């Protein structure tokens, strides 16, 4: 709202969000002030799913931390060379729209077990992709990796201390 107020005297006519969610924009306030709000709901889906997958590989194999160590002139192969395989691990996807579905397909392709939570159930998608919907508590308890692709609906944090307490030790959260 502050940015909208500051721009009102200019030729400012539209806010465009490069992505799906509009939770960081006061849409009603913008509309009340004659400013259109647009987003790009389809454009980044594949890229975001690929990036989430890359983050999982990076965490599983210590790629980022090992790279940083090497740039500092250290060779700590024993410390960072072990890692874990993603195959056989469970990925919980919170938000099973376009991005979540693409990520689920990628994860299944490398042998991960995948479960999903979404407040909106898309008819037939469980059977089509072979990825079951589960309740949030079950997803939190059984997942080795959790990838979040949904905004908090109540304005609070989607992943909070209460939900973290329900997760496995060592879980990796991708957001």
Residues covered by each model-derived region:
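Conserved beta-strand positions in the Rossmann-like core of class I SAM-dependent methyltransferases
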Residues: 115
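N-terminal Rossmann-fold NAD(P) dinucleotide-binding loop
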Residues: 100-101
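Phosphate-coordination loops involved in phosphoryl transfer and adenosine-cofactor binding
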Residues: 12, 87-90, 161, 170
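Rossmann-like adenosine-cofactor binding region
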Residues: 119-175
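Glycine-rich Rossmann-fold phosphate-binding loop(s) that bind the pyrophosphate
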Residues: 96-97
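Well-formed, non-transmembrane alpha-helical positions, independent of function
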Residues: 3-6, 28-29, 85, 125, ...
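Phosphate-binding beta-alpha-beta segment of Rossmann-like dinucleotide-binding domains, i.e.
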Residues: 33, 41-90, 105, 109
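An N-terminal-biased, well-structured beta-alpha scaffold segment characteristic
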Residues: 1-38, 160
């Amino acid at each position: 709202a502050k940015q909208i107020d500051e721009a009102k005297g200019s030729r400012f006519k539209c806010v465009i969000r490069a992505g799906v969610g509009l939770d960081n924009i006061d849409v009603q306030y913008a509309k009340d002030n004659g400013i259109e709000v647009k987003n790009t709901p389809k454009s980044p889906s594949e890229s975001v799913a690929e990036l989430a997958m890359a983050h999982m590989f990076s965490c599983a194999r210590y790629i980022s931390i090992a790279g940083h160590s090497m740039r500092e002139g250290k060779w700590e192969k024993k410390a960072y060379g072990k890692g874990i395989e993603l195959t056989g691990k469970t990925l919980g996807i919170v938000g099973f729209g376009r991005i979540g579905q693409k990520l689920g397909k990628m994860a299944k392709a490398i042998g991960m077990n995948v479960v999903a939570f979404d407040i909106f159930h898309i008819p037939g998608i469980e059977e089509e992709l072979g990825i079951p919907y589960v309740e949030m508590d079950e997803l939190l308890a059984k997942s080795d990796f959790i990838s979040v692709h949904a905004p908090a609906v109540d304005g609070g944090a989607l992943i909070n201390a209460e939900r973290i307490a329900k997760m496995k030790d060592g879980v990796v959260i991708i957001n």
